[in-house]
Regions:
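C-terminal substrate-binding/catalytic lobe of Rossmann-fold NAD(P)-dependent oxidoreductases
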Residues: 1-22, 117-253
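Rossmann-fold NAD(P) dinucleotide-binding segment
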Residues: 21-30, 38-57
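Gly/Ser/Thr-rich loops at beta-strand to alpha-helix junctions
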Residues: 38, 61-64, 85-94, 115-119, ...
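General beta-strand structural signal in soluble alpha/beta enzymes
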Residues: 56-57, 82-86, 112, 135-136
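Rossmann-fold NAD(P)-binding glycine/threonine-rich loop
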Residues: 58-84
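Short alpha-helices
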Residues: 76-101, 249
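Oxidoreductase and adenylate-handling cofactor-binding alpha/beta cores
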Residues: 92-108, 123-133, 255
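NAD(P)-dependent Rossmann-like dehydrogenase/reductase catalytic/cofactor-binding core
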Residues: 230-291
């Protein structure tokens, strides 16, 4: 977006064009990259890691190893530190999956997402003929979560772990039954899930579905001995997915600067960052107040 189109929250916040970024290398301690994982970050991540310490939220899980390698080379060559795939998944959920495996090696890890608004699935709903507007939420199955929490280590199918719920505004003259069948039978999006379609008014959509909540659970179910089942659980309930992700990025920006000052250069992930580096408090304060 053009700088003139942006309205900062505060009058003292400067806004510059992307083309002018290189002129500010001496003034920026850490650059937080907020671009998308599909098209923006694969190009921007390596390019900007050659000039700045960076933090990003690249979240295409299957491509993280190749993205790490692409960012690591320019960052290392220029003495910069680049924290990649920072957020809540990947990020906070990743850390808790690691903790679960390390602490309970005899076990199974389960990740549930939601309740949350899915932007990609919402877009798919809006492309169905007869749909004027709509959103889609991913909901974790309470029954599946309770089975996991019991320590039983169930094998769960995609349909058993999550359901999907759509809120749709019909276009004028559209047939509700036809639209519903087009949605619930859509391959790669809804056909493999139990999907509920709710038809609502435009006013209801504006009133009730403008925020971007999300969240989920990471649960490790395992045994430390045959008779003793153990369950580790980490959960998030977020009213604003982007605001929470931003909070995580800012905390890790603090760590990126500190790592760079220690001479730890190149690409890093959440697995490489000691928790104390995230805090504004000194190591002594943390030992006294939180340990």
């Amino acid at each position: 977006r053009a700088p003139a189109d942006l309205v900062p929250l505060g009058p003292r916040t400067p806004v510059y064009a992307m083309d002018a970024l290189a002129e500010h290398q001496q003034a920026i301690d850490v650059l937080i990259l907020c671009g998308g994982s599909k098209d923006d970050l694969p190009a921007q991540g390596p390019q900007l890691a050659a000039m700045f310490n960076t933090v990003d939220s690249f979240d295409t899980h299957a491509r993280i190893p190749e993205y790490f390698a692409a960012v690591d080379e320019p960052a290392r060559a220029n003495g910069k530190t680049a924290l990649i795939s920072i957020g809540w998944d990947p990020g906070m959920f990743s850390i808790n999956r690691l903790y679960g495996e390390a602490l309970l090696p005899d076990g199974v890890t389960y990740t549930f997402w939601g309740k949350g608004l899915s932007q990609g699935h919402s877009d798919a709903v809006r492309r169905v003929p007869g749909v004027k507007a709509g959103v889609q939420y991913t909901l974790p199955s309470p029954e599946a979560i309770e089975r996991v929490r019991s320590g039983a280590r169930p094998e769960l199918s995609t349909r058993e772990k999550h359901t999907r719920e759509c809120f749709v505004v019909l276009a004028e003259g559209a047939d509700a039954a036809t639209v519903e069948q087009a949605i619930v039978g859509m391959p790669n999006y809804f056909a493999d899930y139990d999907t509920t379609v709710n038809f609502i008014s435009e006013d209801e959509l504006r009133r009730d579905h403008q925020r971007m909540p999300h969240g989920g659970f990471v649960i490790r179910s395992g045994n430390t001995s045959e008779p003793h089942a153990q369950v580790i659980e980490y959960s998030l309930q977020l009213e604003s997915n982007p605001e929470f992700t931003a909070s995580v990025l800012v905390a890790y920006a603090r760590a990126a600067y500190r790592l760079n000052q220690q001479g730890q250069i190149g690409a890093k992930t959440a697995f490489d960052v000691a928790p104390g580096l995230l805090s504004i408090k000194s190591a002594g304060q943390l030992r006294e107040e939180l340990l």
